[in-house]
Amino acid sequence: MQVTFHGVRGSVPVSGPAFQHFGGHTTCLNLKSKDMQVIIDAGSGFQNVQIAEDRPVLLMFSHFHHDHIQGLAFNGDLLRQDRDIFVSSALYPADKVKASLQTYFDGVYFPIDLINHKHQMRFVDFDELELAYSAETGWTVTSDITGDDVRVMEETPINTGAYLDGR
């Protein structure tokens, strides 16, 4: 499994010499195996994610603060791809995930209506992911939400990874 942190900052992206070591992008984690790709959050670091063309792709949101969604419209692969990308969050059902992103990326607050423009984004309920991805790839996708801490875990027979995000 390949794990890449494309952003780890909170609030706003920053630049300059002081940020060269850890980077200045907001939250985005990319997990790739031979079977699938899981992207957690689409902060400003999402612009650097290469979206796989040869395996299922899942984009999960830990929550919908600005620093976790602001990069969604700036990934060239997402804008060019014609294949399905599954979008979900453990916090809300699929329709509320879609509505939350539509509010942020509509024609009023953003130059284009991104969510309606990108028809290949398939919004799915988090509960359905475990069944779909376990059957197709052998991965298990689970979440345990306690208080202000969202835990999302991806697990294969030989690899386990957990993403812990304290809002």
Residue ranges, per PLM feature:
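Binuclear metal-dependent hydrolase catalytic cores
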Residues: M1-R167
